[in-house]
Curated annotation (Swiss-Prot):
Signal peptide region: none
Membrane-spanning parts: none
Gene encoding the protein: pfd-6
UniProt-recorded Gene Ontology molecular function terms: protein-folding chaperone binding; unfolded protein binding
Protein name in the entry: Probable prefoldin subunit 6
């Protein structure tokens, strides 16, 4: 019975890793959307003349912002998002590796249980 408890614990670890992977994929997808949006904003700002007026939404109010400041802010946001994507991708790689290892561990335990069950059946058949 202790073996079965250990098996269930290992399955639980695998499920946790799979949930983590889903969370990281979702996070990466969200960051990709932010990256695309920020690239579009940067492209729009790059098309503007130096005397163009730029407004920034702060709560319910539009506030005038310097064009160079807006470009700088968007550039920093792009750098931040790209670094976050790299961090999440590293986490995805790590959790994928751990998931594969955990899946192998669970499969090996399952095979061992099946072999024990087969041996028990064979021994029971021999006793008859």
């Amino acid at each position: 019975m202790a073996d079965m408890a250990k098996f269930e614990e290992e399955i639980s670890k695998l499920k946790t890793l799979e949930k983590d992977r889903e969370k990281y994929f979702s996070s990466r997808q969200e960051m990709e959307m932010r990256l695309t949006e920020s690239k579009n904003v940067k492209a729009e700002l790059d098309l503007m003349d130096s005397d163009s007026k730029v407004y920034k939404l702060m709560g319910p109010v539009l506030v005038r912002q310097d064009l160079e400041e807006a470009r700088s802010t968007v550039e920093k946001r792009l750098e931040f998002i790209e670094s976050e994507i790299k961090r999440v991708e590293a986490s995805i790689t790590d959790v994928n590796k751990k998931s594969i290892e955990q899946r192998d561990k669970v499969m090996n335990m399952q095979k061992a249980f099946q072999m024990m069950a087969t041996q028990a059946q064979q021994q029971a058949a021999q006793k008859k």
